[in-house]
UniProtKB/Swiss-Prot annotation:
This is NADH-ubiquinone oxidoreductase chain 4L. One of its GO terms (molecular function) is NADH dehydrogenase (ubiquinone) activity. The chain crosses the membrane at residues 2-22, 29-49, 61-81. Its main location: mitochondrion. One of its GO terms (biological process) is ATP synthesis coupled electron transport. Disulfide bonds: none annotated. GO terms for cellular component: mitochondrial inner membrane; respiratory chain complex I. The gene is MT-ND4L. Keywords: Electron transport, Membrane, Mitochondrion, Mitochondrion inner membrane, NAD, Respiratory chain, Translocase, Transmembrane, Transmembrane helix, Transport, Ubiquinone. It comes from Lepilemur mitsinjoensis.
Length: 98
């Protein structure tokens, strides 16, 4: 396995660990989720370039589009929650309540 793949896999693992450690804050969770998506994007580009899958060049772009949509929805949720409650602690929120 090349060193670039090991580094990107390590970045994904660190973002996943950050997601588990900082799960009480919404902003930290969104940043870790974005790091996971970007490392998955780079890994998919490397995989496609190494295996010469010319047909599936659209898959990393689709992943990047979904990551942008996820970030936009997450930031909108963060703004709504911080305007309503004044904090971003996930543990204190009950979003299922009307």
């Amino acid at each position: 396995m090349p060193s670039i793949s090991i580094n990107i896999t390590l970045a994904f693992t660190m973002a996943l660990t950050g997601m588990l450690v900082f799960r009480s804050h919404l902003m930290s969770s969104l940043l870790c989720l974005e790091g996971m998506m970007l490392s998955m994007f780079i890994l998919s580009i490397l995989f496609i370039m190494n295996m010469h899958f010319t047909v599936s060049f659209i898959m990393p772009i689709l992943l990047l589009v979904l990551a942008a949509c996820e970030a936009a929805i997450g930031l909108a949720l963060l703004v709504m929650v911080s305007n309503t409650y004044g904090l971003d602690y996930v543990q204190n929120l009950n979003l299922l309540q009307c």
